[in-house]
């Protein structure tokens, strides 16, 4: 069986699956965004299952709310990010993962080093400092750990599987509206109920 690479960026631009509208606080979109971005940081690809504390992940305003207060609670301006990437990005601008495929911009080699494939990739790496030695080391440690676990699928699932607490979006506080209601059926929770969710991603 071929297992997914832990640091493979998406080969296509992200297409929003969900579209809840009308929450009074942007934090209420958290579980929608967890599902939207597959429980990992959109920038560095670190997964929830690799970090243990809820506060390790935040909701990043892609267009900074300090400069664009009108979209502070706009779901389509929010992405799921680890606290380190969110803090480093701050109010800086990056190529949108919905406009460009990050997999066409960035590549992580087997030694954990990240490479820019174009100018967008150079910008992402520079702004987020993704080529810092500690990032390279962390990626290498995880790549080697995953490689060493390929004969132990149950343990490997802890690293490459989905988190246990998949959000049931139908049970979330109902938003005022949802411009993509069909996305709930395609959520990871619903797919698991239908036995359509793969073991690894």
Ranges and model annotations:
Residues 2-43, 68-73:
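Short, charged surface segments at domain edges that flank catalytic/cofactor-binding sites
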Residues 13-19, 52, 96, 149, ...:
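Alpha-helical interaction segments
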Residues 24, 39-44, 61-62, 85-90, ...:
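Short amphipathic alpha-helical surface micro-motifs
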Residues 29-56, 82-85:
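Short cysteine-rich loop/turn motifs with clustered Cys
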Residues 46-80, 92-107:
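Histidine-centered nuclease catalytic patch
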Residues 72-84, 112-123:
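Short, Lys/Arg-enriched charge-dense amphipathic segments
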Residues 89-161:
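Conserved, surface-exposed functional patches that form binding/active-site neighborhoods
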Residues 132-201:
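C-terminal, charged low-complexity interaction regions
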């Amino acid at each position: 069986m071929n297992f997914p690479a832990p640091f493979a960026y998406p080969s296509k631009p992200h297409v929003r699956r969900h579209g809840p509208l009308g929450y009074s606080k942007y934090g209420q979109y958290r579980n929608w965004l967890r599902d939207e971005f597959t429980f990992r940081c959109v920038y560095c690809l670190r997964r929830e299952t690799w970090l243990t504390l809820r506060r390790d992940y935040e909701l990043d305003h892609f267009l900074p709310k300090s400069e664009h207060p009108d979209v502070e609670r706009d779901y389509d301006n929010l992405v799921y990010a680890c606290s380190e990437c969110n803090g480093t990005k701050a109010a800086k601008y990056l190529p949108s993962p919905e406009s460009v495929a990050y997999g066409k911009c960035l590549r992580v080699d087997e030694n954990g080093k990240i490479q820019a494939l174009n100018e967008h990739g150079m910008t992402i790496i520079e702004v987020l400092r993704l080529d810092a030695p500690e990032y390279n080391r962390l990626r290498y440690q995880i790549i080697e750990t995953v490689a060493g676990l390929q004969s132990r699928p149950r343990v490997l699932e802890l690293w490459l599987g989905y988190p246990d607490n998949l959000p049931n979006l139908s049970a979330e506080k109902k938003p005022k509206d949802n411009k993509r209601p069909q996305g709930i059926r395609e959520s990871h929770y619903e797919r698991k109920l239908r036995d359509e969710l793969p073991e690894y991603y």
